[in-house]
């Protein structure tokens, strides 16, 4: 740390304190295994599949974006 000004060392101490606080927060988080998280996600998706319009299509009569059918008549 030769040639370093006191301001820079103070800033690095402040940054180190912030990092320590962040690491303490992350260490205290409750973690679960990826396999359990994936299983929970699949269970949730299966339970809510009937409510998902991308899986269960909206009935044509209720679809506001359906194509309008135009009939041409020759006079």
From Swiss-Prot:
The modification Phosphothreonine is found at residues 5, 10. It is found in: Cell membrane. GO terms for cellular component: cell body; dendrite; heterotrimeric G-protein complex; postsynaptic density; synapse. The modification Phosphoserine is found at residues 9, 12. SUPFAM superfamilies: Transducin (heterotrimeric G protein), gamma chain. A lipid is attached at residue 72 (S-geranylgeranyl cysteine). Its main location: membrane. Residues 73-75 form a propeptide. It is a lipid-anchor. One of its GO terms (biological process) is positive regulation of cytosolic calcium ion concentration. Keywords: Cell membrane, Lipoprotein, Membrane, Methylation, Phosphoprotein, Prenylation, Transducer. The modification Cysteine methyl ester is found at residue 72. Transmembrane segments: none annotated. Pfam families: G-gamma. One of its GO terms (molecular function) is G-protein beta-subunit binding. It comes from the Eukaryota. Abundantly expressed in brain. Low levels in testis. Belongs to the G protein gamma family. G proteins are composed of 3 units, alpha, beta and gamma. Forms a complex with GNAO1 and GNB1. Interacts with SCN8A. Guanine nucleotide-binding proteins (G proteins) are involved as a modulator or transducer in various transmembrane signaling systems. The beta and gamma chains are required for the GTPase activity, for replacement of GDP by GTP, and for G protein-effector interaction. This is Guanine nucleotide-binding protein G(I)/G(S)/G(O) subunit gamma-3. It comes from Mus musculus (Mouse). The lineage of its organism: Eukaryota, Metazoa, Chordata, Craniata, Vertebrata.
């Amino acid at each position: 740390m030769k040639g370093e000004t006191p301001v820079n060392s103070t800033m690095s101490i402040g940054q180190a304190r912030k990092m320590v606080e962040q690491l303490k927060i992350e260490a205290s988080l409750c973690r679960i295994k990826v396999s359990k998280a994936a299983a929970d996600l699949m269970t949730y998706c299966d339970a809510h599949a009937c409510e998902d319009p991308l899986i269960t299509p909206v009935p044509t009569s209720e679809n506001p974006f359906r194509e309008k059918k135009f009939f041409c008549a020759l006079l």
